[in-house]
Amino acid sequence: GQILSIGRVQTPTLALIVKRQEEIDNFKPEPYWVLATIYRDTQFTATKGKFTSKEEGEKAFSTIEGKPFTITNVTKKKGTEQPKQLYDLTSLQVDCNRKYGYSAEMTLNTIQSLYERKLTTYPRVDTQYLSDDIYPKCPQTMNGLFQTTFAGKRPYAELVKTLGGKPLLKSKRVFDSSKVTDHHAIIPTGIPPQGLTDVERNVYDLIARRFIAAFYPDCKFATTTVLGEVDKIEFKVSGKEILDKGWRV
């Protein structure tokens, strides 16, 4: 059989990916029914949840069919979403598996190759933070990303350009020396990559975009929730409106 390195950092990921695959393989979809109504071109769904039998759903529907729908409450809440934390090995393996279907071992081999070519930092890490002494080097790394070219295009130029002309944001979610021991989170070195395979490029791209996003402001949004009722049965719809994309650009 194959020998897999079960290190302190790697075990949870392999277990996580294997467990997830087992869940997918063993998943048996079960049919269910929900009560829904259209009001002013918007679908509202009953808050009482799912019906496991069609008869049960039809019975509930028959009690409200043809009765008037009334809006009972409208609330609007503002919220923010912070940029995702930088990658450690585990979170990178999970994202590569989720987005590209790469195994934990494949991601590790790829990131090891990028590290050996001095394109990304040391990969076998279990921290998502940078030490404070890395901050002064970040503009230089950004400059390298700005110049990076893949197939005649510069995928990071616009993202980096938006951050130009002002000091980079220094967040405690990114820079915290107390959370770093021997090695820090995985980031690009700033050396523009050349001759990457498709797999290498995909892994590099995740790391580069995560690094750039760490210096962007929070994404700001508003969530509107509207409640209505028909004959004491409550219906609800929620919508999210982005007010300022921030790092989600």
Residue ranges and their predicted role:
Residues G1-V249:
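Core catalytic DNA strand-manipulation module of type IA topoisomerases
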